[in-house]
From Swiss-Prot:
InterPro entries linked: F-box-like_dom_sf (IPR036047), F-box_dom (IPR001810), FBD (IPR006566), FBL13/AtMIF1-like (IPR050232), LRR_dom_sf (IPR032675), LRR_FXL15/At3g58940/PEG3-like (IPR055411)
Cysteine pairs bridged by disulfides in the record: none
Transmembrane segments: none
Full protein name: Putative FBD-associated F-box protein At5g50270
Lineage: Eukaryota, Viridiplantae, Streptophyta, Embryophyta, Tracheophyta
Gene3D superfamilies: Ribonuclease Inhibitor
Organism: Arabidopsis thaliana (Mouse-ear cress)
Occurrences of domain FBD (ranges): 345-408
Domain F-box, residue spans: 1-54
């Protein structure tokens, strides 16, 4: 212990920050005089009211005392994990008490499964957290404020299963984040938002998800205007997603959607370099009908991962190959397992070989290959015409040796 106690404060504080809870950090004060006040300067504070099944009244008083006794001038991370009996007044007081330490990261997670009533975050969140760089909220309720919100330093924002006052509040909240670069949104049911509008010029990374519990609704969806976006991840089982004014810097996109007209969305991300695509059942036919003769050309696309969970995926692939002249790498995988019958045969006989197959395609990986007649035709087509092909890896769906032999 003497050797450890002799280490510099900076290193000891870093070690204490790795402990899972402030309560564990405070216990170290009994180790020696060297440690007696060290806990008051730890830059990362994690308060978990479910930790060691502590009675909430004791937990609340512990948070009050530890914040009151804190010595260090700054807090890097303030993290609350709250559940049953969490009081709205407590959250308000804790945010105000900690605001004098200019904390840069605030995380509030509410366990709604045990909470008797929704935890409403205080108005002070918008007025006393101007130094925040990262804000992560989970299963909380935001309230409207009369004065404009402002997060001048906020770069990272995560809103998971959060409930809002309405559409206009979301617009106001995001417009107040002038340097926001990373946004995560996971919509829950009854979140009071029909159209979730994301119009942030500085945004570089965007993750949009809708809860599986939300019923598909053609009247609800996302509107995105993010000209600086480089990374997009969208998982949406209904509604719409409109991209306004393009995203010329988009490098990577993960798209798993169920849209009636997905080609309108795909035509908005044609600048992407790497694309993971899963069009859920009933979307692919619509996509193919719209994609040609209205041609979707991905001029910068070098890698595609295509999910084979729908029986029309082969025809979608044919469209993508024709519209991706610089494609280098192709991966096929069944991620969602929706397919219950063999893939439909190609409607396009591919009599004209796509440019990428002739001049750029180098690698093909096929996971869960079933060896159907249509799939064999595709393999033969690529092997016969792939002038630049260097590697073709096939992983059969079946592990049975006899079935594997039949696939050849």
């Amino acid at each position: 212990m003497d050797r450890i106690s002799g280490l510099p404060d900076e290193l000891l504080l870093r070690v204490l920050s790795l402990l899972p809870n402030v309560k564990d950090v405070v216990v170290t004060m009994v180790l020696s005089k060297r440690w007696q006040f060290l806990w008051m300067m730890v830059p990362k504070l994690v308060y978990d009211d479910s930790y060691q099944n502590l009675e909430y009244g004791k937990f609340s008083r512990f948070v009050d005392r530890s914040l009151f006794m804190r010595k260090a001038p700054g807090i890097e991370t303030l993290h609350f994990k709250l559940g049953q009996n969490c009081g709205n007044g407590d959250i308000q007081w804790w945010i105000r008490a900690a605001s004098k330490f200019c904390f840069r990261e605030l995380i509030i997670e509410i366990n709604c499964s045990t909470s008797a009533s929704p935890s409403i975050l205080p108005r002070s969140l918008y007025t006393e957290c101007r130094m925040l760089v990262t804000l992560k909220l989970k299963k909380a309720v935001l309230v409207d404020v009369s004065s404009p919100t402002c997060f001048p330093s906020l770069k990272n924002l995560s809103l998971v299963s959060v409930k809002y006052p309405g559409n206009e509040f979301v617009k106001s909240l995001l417009s107040s984040c002038h340097v926001l670069e990373d946004l995560v949104v996971e919509q829950c049911i009854n979140d009071n938002v029909t159209i979730f509008s994301v119009k942030v010029p500085s945004l570089k990374s965007l993750v949009l998800r809708t809860s599986k519990e939300r019923a598909p609704d053609g009247e609800s969806g996302f509107v995105v205007e993010a000209p600086s976006l480089e990374y997009l991840d969208i998982d949406q089982t209904g509604g719409f997603c409109v991209i306004e004014n393009g995203m010329p810097n988009l490098a990577e996109a993960y798209v798993s959607v169920l849209h009636h007209h997905p080609v309108k969305f795909l035509s908005s991300i044609t600048s992407v370099k790497r694309l993971y695509l899963c069009l859920l059942p009933h979307s692919i036919l619509s996509c193919m009908q719209d994609m040609y003769p209205i041609r979707c050309v991905f001029h910068r696309l070098v890698h595609i991962t295509l999910c084979t969970c729908d029986d029309e995926w082969l025809n979608l692939l044919a469209c993508l190959l024709k519209g991706s002249p610089k494609l280098i790498s192709l991966k096929l995988e069944k991620h969602h397992g929706h397919l219950i019958c063999s893939p439909s045969p190609l409607r396009d006989d591919l009599s004209s070989v796509p440019e990428c197959v002739l001049s750029s395609l180098e690698t093909v990986e096929w996971v869960d290959y079933e060896g159907t007649e249509a799939e064999r035709q595709l393999v033969e087509f690529i092997l016969r015409n792939g002038s630049c092909l260097k590697k073709f890896v096939i992983s059969p769906e079946s592990v049975n040796p006899d079935k594997k032999y039949e696939m050849i």
